[in-house]
């Protein structure tokens, strides 16, 4: 089972539980304050997930480390590739 399938199953399960509670399919008579909170719950969850994602990306960007060894290796590979292409007749 792929990660996408797991997420889709989870969303379907949560969505069907939300729909069953809000539409009264289970026969439960929820108090009015609970129903007031239940209706906008998907929007709250979506906004919360977006805030979490934004915070995670911001934290990862703020704590990003420079990879000087990898940069030197990549630059040497670029020089090597340019020399190989120049030998084959490509001009820069």
Curated annotation (Swiss-Prot):
It comes from the Eukaryota. It is found in: Endoplasmic reticulum membrane. One of its GO terms (molecular function) is enzyme activator activity. InterPro entries: DPM3. The chain crosses the membrane at residues 8-28, 37-57. One of its GO terms (cellular component) is dolichol-phosphate-mannose synthase complex. It is a multi-pass membrane protein. GO terms for biological process: dolichol metabolic process; GPI anchor biosynthetic process; protein glycosylation; regulation of protein stability. Pathway: Protein modification; protein glycosylation. Keywords: Endoplasmic reticulum, Membrane, Transmembrane, Transmembrane helix. Stabilizer subunit of the dolichol-phosphate mannose (DPM) synthase complex; tethers catalytic subunit DPM1 to the endoplasmic reticulum. Component of the dolichol-phosphate mannose (DPM) synthase complex composed of DPM1, DPM2 and DPM3; within the complex, associates with DPM1 via its C-terminal domain and with DPM2 via its N-terminal portion. This interaction stabilizes DPM1 protein. Belongs to the DPM3 family. This is Dolichol-phosphate mannosyltransferase subunit 3. It comes from Mus musculus (Mouse).
């Amino acid at each position: 089972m792929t990660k996408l399938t797991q997420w889709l199953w989870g969303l379907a399960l949560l969505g069907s539980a939300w729909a069953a509670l809000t539409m009264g399919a289970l026969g439960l008579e929820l108090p009015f304050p609970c129903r007031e909170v239940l209706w906008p719950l998907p929007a709250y969850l979506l906004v919360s997930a977006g805030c979490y994602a934004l915070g995670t990306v911001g934290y990862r960007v703020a704590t990003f480390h420079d990879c000087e060894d990898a940069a030197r290796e990549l630059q040497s590979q670029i020089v090597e590739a340019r020399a190989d292409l120049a030998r084959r007749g490509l001009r820069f």
